[in-house]
Every structure is written in structure tokens, then in C-alpha cells.
Amino acid sequence: MSIEQKFAPTITNEQTASLPAIRFEGEVQIVDTEQGLIEACDYLSQHSVIGFDTETRPSFKAGVTNRVALIQLSTSDRCYLIRLCRMRFGRELQRLLENPNVIKVGADVAGDIRSLNQLRHLRAAGFIDLQTIAPQWGIEEKSLRKLSAIVLGKRVSKAQRLSNWEAAQFTEQQISYAATDAWVCLEILSALESTPKVNPAPVQEVEKRVEPKKKPRRSAPKKTAPKQDKPSEPKPSNEAKEKARRRPFRRRKPLNKKQNTEIK
């Protein structure tokens, strides 16, 4: 029995723009001190699932990429905006991002983790990427804006995406945008999990094992008889050398006139 697909696989930009906007209405706390980070991580560690996102000041120069300026972590009613550009990357935050018991859900998680690794090497664990799991519900779209439109029927504003995330003070629009991006990931995951999958992932993924190529056997070298060295001539003994040295030198007889004429 096939399961009816509830969500549309794709949605156009025009359809997305016509939807009502969605925004986070809970408490937002901006963290830019070490003590504030400790308190935020302690609170977030008590939750089993939190929303996750990052922001980076845009660069308008080819080949230049800035480091992550902000990391957003949200529960259903409270969002922390952690300003990494104004404080160190604390171990409390590292432990939270490496904790497999606290699920962090976001979109394009792999890209965010790569960017965070420029600040501190992470053994990231407990992450769910909406882009990766969405196909299990027949959804082909990847962007957070379109995932929200398809799953929630709501539009996420992207007006502040290219704003300055290293500014001394955030605007109200920036705060709302950043908090909504992390929180809406929770809402999307909740809606997906309450809906039957049309392409369920296998219980256990079987890895394809590639047998190593066998090297061709080398034929054994033919056994050849060892080359026999030619018997070397015996070296003359010292006694023979001495006799040769003492042997009288015989002068050659001069040719007579008759022989000399014949030679000419």
C-alpha cells in the first residue's frame, strides 16, 4: 500500500512570495560574554532538540570569505544569538556542538560546520540536516526558505541575509531574522516527523565494499645454472718470474746483403 505524498516536491519563487510571513515570537538573548555563553550552553544542554544556524558577514570581493560572526541556537521559546566575532569560541559551546544527546537541526549543516572549523576544530555530533532528510517526504527543494514554504506554508524573510553581522549593534530586523532562521528549523522538523514518509530511509545503511584490485601474479624467475667462470690462467710464481728475469737477452742477427736485397 503506497503512502500519499502530503508535501509538494517543489515550489516556485512566486508561490513562495505569496505566502504569509513567519517569525520567531519568543525570547531572544544576545550573548557576547564568557559568562553569558556558559549560561546559554547550560540551558540549551537541558533540551533534546534545538534549532541551529550561523551567519557570516558577506564579502563582496572574489575569493574572500569572512569567518562566522554569529551562531544561533534556539528552543521552541528562547533563542540565543552568540556573537563569535566579539568573544572567544568557548569550550562550553564546543561541548554542546559535540554532544550527540542534544540534537541540532539546521539546513546545510555541513557548510556551517566547515565554517565553524575555521574557528575551532569540532568533532560535530548530533546534527540533523533538513536538506538531507527532506527527500524522505518527497521534497526536492533545499533552501530553508522553500522548505518552510512547502512544509509550513509560511514564508521566511531573507531581507537581512546580506547585512553586516559584525556590526557593533544589531538592528531589530537582524535580530528577528537570525532568531527565526534557527527556530523555524525546529518547526519544520516537527512537521515532518508528524507526517508519514514516502521514501523512508533504510533502517541500516549498507556500505558498498569495494574489493581491492588483485595485483597480477608475477611468474617465478626461471632458474638458470650459475655461470661458470672461465678458469683463469695460473699466475706465474715468484720463482718463474725470477728465472724469466735472469734469462739472457738474445740479440737479433742482422740481415745479410742478399736477404736485404730480397726484402727491397
Predicted ranges, named:
Residues R209-K227, S237-K258:
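Arginine-glycine-rich low-complexity intrinsically disordered regions
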Residues S176-K214:
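Mixed-charge, glycine-rich, non-catalytic linkers/tails in nucleic-acid processing enzymes
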Residues Q160-S163, A201:
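Short coil/turn segments at secondary-structure boundaries
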Residues M1-S48, L119, L130, P200, ...:
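N-terminal accessory regions of nucleic-acid-interacting proteins
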Residues E25, Q29-D32, G36, S45-V49, ...:
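Conserved DEDDh/DEDDy metal-dependent 3′-5′ exonuclease domain
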Residues E233-P236, K264:
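C-terminal alpha-helical interaction module
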